[in-house]
């Protein structure tokens, strides 16, 4: 996979791509990336990339020319048909399923904006996806794109050391993830559930599934509307106040 990030502040990304899992993935060439300052594509003599909105109003709007030209330039370098992702609060909210969908692509282009917004023609004519990371507004699209890139890259083959890690994450099954425990088995009197020490993998799997169901019921009940439950699981959740662990 190759990722192009169009931004006015490429320096914001250096720490992200030089740390942790993303850095290892870059070193192993499991994905490549380019940071593109779309100001460099402005044909304005002062390299302006924004202007006042037609019809009046507060703030400045990103002009279409620099972004159109930047997107077309990075497309031509790879001769590809990439997904062009606009980070904006009006987009669809990022989900694990969306990340899994994007992880199947060969080329992603992220557009990170600033100011009041984008000229609508950018949305209409070059963007394939609009993504938001939540119902709040940031100063720019950079932080949001970092979140999306991280959630996508970790799903690429061999990026995570344990290939079972990603499929078992929260939301991958439609449920929140079950609780985790490690050594010691007894810490300050707080004990690990006996079933996890039993070595009976069928019982462990059953316990984990039940805990995922109960945790989802208690914390994100809306997610249960999107999955099919067995009769036994429905009985589990029909108790008055199911408790975790």
Swiss-Prot record:
<dbReference type="InterPro" id="IPR023148">
    <property type="entry name" value="tRNA_m1G_MeTrfase_C_sf"/>
</dbReference>
<dbReference type="GO" id="GO:0002939">
    <property type="term" value="P:tRNA N1-guanine methylation"/>
</dbReference>
<keyword id="KW-0949">S-adenosyl-L-methionine</keyword>
<comment type="similarity">
    <text>Belongs to the RNA methyltransferase TrmD family.</text>
</comment>
<keyword id="KW-0489">Methyltransferase</keyword>
<keyword id="KW-0963">Cytoplasm</keyword>
<comment type="function">
    <text>Specifically methylates guanosine-37 in various tRNAs.</text>
</comment>
<dbReference type="GO" id="GO:0005829">
    <property type="term" value="C:cytosol"/>
</dbReference>
<dbReference type="InterPro" id="IPR002649">
    <property type="entry name" value="tRNA_m1G_MeTrfase_TrmD"/>
</dbReference>
<dbReference type="Pfam" id="PF01746">
    <property type="entry name" value="tRNA_m1G_MT"/>
</dbReference>
<comment type="subunit">
    <text>Homodimer.</text>
</comment>
<dbReference type="InterPro" id="IPR029026">
    <property type="entry name" value="tRNA_m1G_MTases_N"/>
</dbReference>
<protein>
    <recommendedName>
        <fullName>tRNA (guanine-N(1)-)-methyltransferase</fullName>
        <ecNumber>2.1.1.228</ecNumber>
    </recommendedName>
</protein>
<feature type="binding site">
    <location>
        <begin position="133"/>
        <end position="138"/>
    </location>
    <ligand>
        <name>S-adenosyl-L-methionine</name>
    </ligand>
</feature>
<dbReference type="InterPro" id="IPR016009">
    <property type="entry name" value="tRNA_MeTrfase_TRMD/TRM10"/>
</dbReference>
<dbReference type="GO" id="GO:0052906">
    <property type="term" value="F:tRNA (guanine(37)-N1)-methyltransferase activity"/>
</dbReference>
<keyword id="KW-0808">Transferase</keyword>
<dbReference type="InterPro" id="IPR029028">
    <property type="entry name" value="Alpha/beta_knot_MTases"/>
</dbReference>
<keyword id="KW-0819">tRNA processing</keyword>
<feature type="binding site">
    <location>
        <position position="113"/>
    </location>
    <ligand>
        <name>S-adenosyl-L-methionine</name>
    </ligand>
</feature>
